[in-house]
Amino acid sequence: WITTYGYVENVAEGIALTIGNSRALKRVFNIGEVAPVNHLEWSRRIAEVLGWNGDIEISDDPTIEFAQRLSSLDLSVQFQIDSRRIREQLGFYETVTITDGLTRTAVDERVRG
């Protein structure tokens, strides 16, 4: 399943680009990463920034609670947006890389407990 994500500072930067900008008037802009990846790849990226070297296995075992919850979802529809308009028309780009954003999030989560 593919979902578009965006790190909060990057999204805020995109929103700031539209404020008071005549090129943004009456336009809708999507803000998100250029090339969204599936959730397995997201899991691998998170594991990497956490320094976790275990195996990630996909299972549809009905005795696993998480698999039970997933079985009720329609994951055939991808939630993937196209952010080309804000990039091409307003010059948006990510100032925080995906790896840095995940690392900052992991640090923040650890601090919060």
Model-based region annotation:
Residues V8, I64-Y93:
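Conserved C-terminal active-site "lid" loop/helix of NAD(P)H-dependent oxidoreductases
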Residues L17, E48, F92, V107-D108:
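Residues within well-ordered alpha-helical secondary structure of globular protein domains
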Residues V8, H39, E94-I98:
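Amphipathic alpha-helical segment in the mid-to-C-terminal domain
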Residues G14-S71:
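Mid/C-terminal beta-alpha module of Rossmann-like enzyme folds, strongest
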Residues V11, I15, I31, W42, ...:
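Non-catalytic, hydrophobic alpha-helical segments
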Residues W1-E9, E33-A35:
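Glycine-rich "substrate-gating" loop/helix at the edge of Rossmann-like oxidoreductase active sites
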Residues T97-G113:
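Amphipathic terminal alpha-helices
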